Amino acid sequence: MCLDDNHLRLEQAISTEWLNLNEAAGPVLLLKGLAPCFASGANGSILLYGQFYDGWRKILDGTGHQVLPLRSKTKGWGDLEFWQQQSASESIRRLYRFDGYEYLAAGCEMVQLADRATGKPLPKPISSRCPK
C-alpha cells in the first residue's frame, strides 16, 4: 500500500549491502528499510540474511539506523554493533553475537552524543547501561 501511495518501487524503499561476517559461510545480505514505507525518522527495519547448507535464513531482525561489523567474533561470526536513534541527542548501542543460529543481543548502552538542552555535540559521548 505505501509503495503504491508514494509511487515507489521496492528497490526505492530498501537499501542492500553485502557483509562478510564469516569467510567460510560466504557473504551476508543486509537489508535496510527506507522512509517513508519501511522507516520513520532515522530508524528503519534492518534484516540480515545468511546462506547456510539448508538455504537462506534470517539471522537478525531489528529496528535501527546503522549496523557495524566488529573485529571480535563469536562462533566464527563477526560481532555486530547496532545503533538505534532515540532522540536528537541520544542513541542506543547494542552488541549482537552469533549463537550458532542467529544474532542475539549481548549488551546494551544508552549513548548521549549531544547536550539535551542545546543540541551541541558533547566533547566525549556519555554511556550508561540500558534500563531493564
Language-model regions, residue ranges each:
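Short, solvent-exposed loop/turn segments at conserved positions within beta-propeller repeat blades
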Residues: 39-44, 87-91
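Hydrophobic/aromatic beta-strand elements that line small-molecule binding cavities or substrate pockets
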Residues: 15-19, 45-49, 69-70, 93-96
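Acidic/hydrophobic-patterned starts of short beta strands in beta-sheet-rich repeat architectures
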Residues: 20-34, 72-84
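Surface-exposed loop/turn elements that mediate protein-protein interactions on large endomembrane-trafficking
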Residues: 47-61, 96-106
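Blade-edge motifs of beta-propeller repeat domains
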Residues: 1-8, 54-66, 107-109
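Extracellular/mature segments of secreted proteins
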Residues: 9-12, 46-48, 116-118
